[in-house]
Amino acid sequence: MSAKLSESDLNDFIGAQVACVKPTRTLHTADEGDEALEVGKEPQEATKVSISLQDCLACAGCITSSEEILLSRQSHGVFLEAWRSLAPKALAVSVAPQSRLSLAQHFGLSVAELDQCLSGVLGSYFGAKYVVGTQLGRELSVQQTNARLVERKQQGVQGPLLCSVCPGFVLYAEKTKPGLVPYMLDVKSPQQITGALLHAADPNIYHLSLMPCFDKKLEAAREDCAREVDCVLTPREFVALLDELQLDLHSFAGAAVPIAQLTPPGWDPRVSWCSSAGSSSGGYAYQYILHMQRLHPGSTIATQAGRNADLLEHRLLAPSGVLLASAGELYGFRNIQNLVRKLLSPATKRSAKVVRRRLPQASPAPPATDPCNADFIEVMACPSGCINGGGLLNGGLGPSQRRDLVSQLNEGYARLPTLDIPMPTYSQPSYIYNLRPLAPTDDVLTVANAW
């Protein structure tokens, strides 16, 4: 006998805040009149729902009930409870560069001043054993990405590979576009690799990660990411944490702990807190082209803008003009929709004829800019990428103000100290996800992710 539920019992049905874009699917059945909801029984039509999180999951649309439970275990309140009973574990904190920039802008500090205040509040007040940036994790992520791409190119495999460090995009592909999964590179993100490195330095730690995106919480909760990150907070939540504890971040500048004291043995603090050339979403596309340029002396890099601000293509050209390698940056759901169509839907003959009619006398020219045709695509769910993450301190701004803020943060990102990512000189453990299509569920308590 099935249990009867009302709408108020289903935690996917809540008051209007952020409406989902569309129902997952529509089921056409005979009208059975007004009935109580039953477990396992879908209504006539999948209704639009709202998510109960204060902020949406970095453009990933609706979330399932089970995911909301996971997110509830990653709040600043949960962190405080864990921190107060941490002994005998030690606290380790990793901070993404986008989070540092957002916090610095919010508090009216330079990034260097913000880093001092963070070392003070995390090292002095919270007693953190380690406080690190995520660049070392990014370095390993980029190196392993490049190695896989070069191996694939040497084997003559055609078609693009997609970066999988954005959990919003990964969730979307695994849940709603399983055909994308074979295109996805399974190298882990800097967040997870940094966590693995910290646990290698001291297995008895509690790892808090400050990330620009709410979806990073779900990434940390993946089965293939177990024990790498214990809790993820966004800059918004970190500010809420400070407010709850009535802490003035500025006051901790005088209590700053030297970064070297908060760095694990064997780590170079300069690497940990620096950045590298490329986009403010990790620079994966540009770093691949730089890597290929080292393998082809005399080659040059040409960067071309796409049809909108969230499309960019980097090309490596031989002295003769021959294309040696290409990589694209593709951000935002509209561009991801186009990517899905190009990868999963064959082009029609009619569209090709239309192009020929429009350009009957076209002279030979280089291929048109299209990141979707590149060897490798740096895909991010958020428009403008990680520098516009849903967890950053950018709420309440209109579109124009938000664009201005993104521009300011990108300028700040470009001013971060940079180091070249070297060619790997030693054997590394592989840091990989177990990417797989996730079967849809008919459970009435679950609403699958849909943008």
From Swiss-Prot:
Cellular component terms (Gene Ontology): cytosolic [4Fe-4S] assembly targeting complex; membrane
Stored Pfam families: Fe_hyd_lg_C
Superkingdom per UniProt: Eukaryota
Binding site for [4Fe-4S] cluster 1: 20, 56, 59, 62
Single Gene Ontology MF annotation: iron-sulfur cluster binding
Keywords: 4Fe-4S, Iron, Iron-sulfur, Metal-binding
TM segment ranges: none
Gene Ontology biological process terms in this record: iron-sulfur cluster assembly
Binding site for [4Fe-4S] cluster 2: 166, 213, 382, 386
Purpose of the protein: Component of the cytosolic Fe/S protein assembly machinery. Required for maturation of extramitochondrial Fe/S proteins. May play a role in the transfer of pre-assembled Fe/S clusters to target apoproteins.
Family: Belongs to the NARF family.
Protein name: Cytosolic Fe-S cluster assembly factor NAR1
Species per Swiss-Prot/TrEMBL record: Eremothecium gossypii (strain ATCC 10895 / CBS 109.51 / FGSC 9923 / NRRL Y-1056)
